[in-house]
Amino acid sequence: MAFTIEVEEWVGSVWHRFITRRASPDFPEARVDLESMQRSLSLMFRAMGGASGVGVEAASARDLVLRRNLLQQVAGTCMQLPVAWCDSSNLRLPQSLAVYPEVSLNQDLYRWLALIAAQAGQMRHWARDNQRWTQALLEQFPAMRPRYQRLVEAHLQLRPDPKQLPKAEAALEAALCQALREPGSVSQFPRCERAPWPLSLWLYPAENLGEPQAVYRVEEGEGDLETPPSGQSRQRNGARRVDDSSSKGGLLLFRLENLFSWSEHVELDRCDDDTEDLDAARVRGPRRTGSVAPRMRQGGGLKLDLDLPASDFDDVPLGEGIKLPEWNYRKQCLQKDFVNLQMMLPCGSEPKPLPLRLSPLARRLRRQFEHLRNDRQWLRQQPQGSELDMQAWLDFHVERQNGQCAERGLFMEQRQNRRDLACLLLADLSMSTDAHLDNEHRVIDVVIDSLLLFGERLSAVGDPFALYGFSSLRRQQVRMQELKSFRQPYGDETRGRIQALKPGYYTRMGAAIRQATELLGNCKQRRKLLLLVTDGKPNDLDLYEGRYGVEDTRQAVMEARRQGLLPFCITIDREAGDYLPYMFGANGYTLIKEPQQSAFPPAAAVQATDPA
């Protein structure tokens, strides 16, 4: 019997692969992946006028009511197809394109979608707006017209034959084909119950669900710093809004009071029945499409935030919280007192020496950087000075004997070398730092080693510096660990605090940068360097993700530059090139590719220790 079942499963899998391949409208041999062109498409999108904070991401398949042929109906395919769309946060393109039988055409289609998205605005009518954007793009760049015509002609050959469609669908198909050939020539489109076959050269409306009708959502910038209910999933699944009709109608087949009477005789402990199931979202698992019903306000009760540890095991707070602003790119305004930042000391920290494994490297670094102290140095080849520069005089004598007599300084002068530099290092301590880089190193281990070696370097140079770490749990709880302030000396107490660091929560980067800017701005040194060590994008549990977090961080970096600071980012995220140039500038960051580079990359070290 088991053998029969295996044969049936094998035959079923073979049939499934066969029928899906035959029913697929794609050309697998000419498939082009978005990942291979994502960087170039991002550059093209921004160069053509697209918003700098908009990223290029993969689009999920969308439900479309299409007319499918017999093979597609038997295979159960083409019910969901990926289409391109754009909103204020992302340009969503299909994860791969195999629309055309040639690789070059699929690549040109990706480029065309990026170009038309840069021209696109708010969509009011799908067909008329796409015609208008296409017409404007071709008028602005006439050299694109031959390439566009090739894409259109190849696309029209793959579309359904209007002669084989019902009258209403045939009329709509003819109008769409005319709109593709001559953009702007069609203003009225026939109504049809079925959607036309996807037009791969056009953008589709964004998948917006509208504002959720949750009564406990706090309006941005208003209200107190309250903690919203937990359990809100960050997973991006397909969704549709439906009316909650569970309270209407229905036949009552039992008496509800009987349930209470029977439960009184059952020996069950129901003290935990009313608590919130924190794993409910995980247990339900991902779905292609979910139903989002309006949520009703629940009754009041005692709400405990189990995300934070007990006070006996938590970091030690330093004073009251600090209210900080936050940039809202949607409203284009700085929301005052929107974030609460709490300065803290690492819990359980004790004075500790430098780990033995780092001692040889630390000694070598101290020897390399001790010569940069504010000591008096001899300047050679000066036009005047207190002593004769014998090497310069010897070179001058040899050149004169050979017939050359170039003017040069023949004296040496001793001057004070003043660096006049203050530096603050800000380390990202989010929960993602608990991940492993390889079999031996975690991200938090690399961060700790970087902090220790950075402290050894600057203590050898003698520059004033400070060390801080940060993580966050929504805007009400931005936690900033003080490892070493500018007033404190660097010693075993600071080393112990660094070695006691643990992964925290999330990464509200803008608030941490603003507080670091305030601390560093109070220094009297002429040059002020703000170093940020991180492992990924800014994000938090609330609205602080995607473009919102990137825009707020960029605004915080710009505020720091306006105050005369030099922000510089050090990251281990291999995808940092997609967003860090926008936040810190093309030369404002560097990438650590190997854990052995935790002793700080050369670019950051040169910028941190270069004499003023």
Curated annotation (Swiss-Prot):
It comes from the Bacteria. Residues 220-246 are annotated as: Disordered. Residues 420-609 form the VWFA domain. Component of the anaerobic respiratory chain that transforms nitrate to dinitrogen (denitrification). PANTHER family: NORD PROTEIN. This is Protein NorD. It comes from Stutzerimonas stutzeri (Pseudomonas stutzeri). The gene is norD.
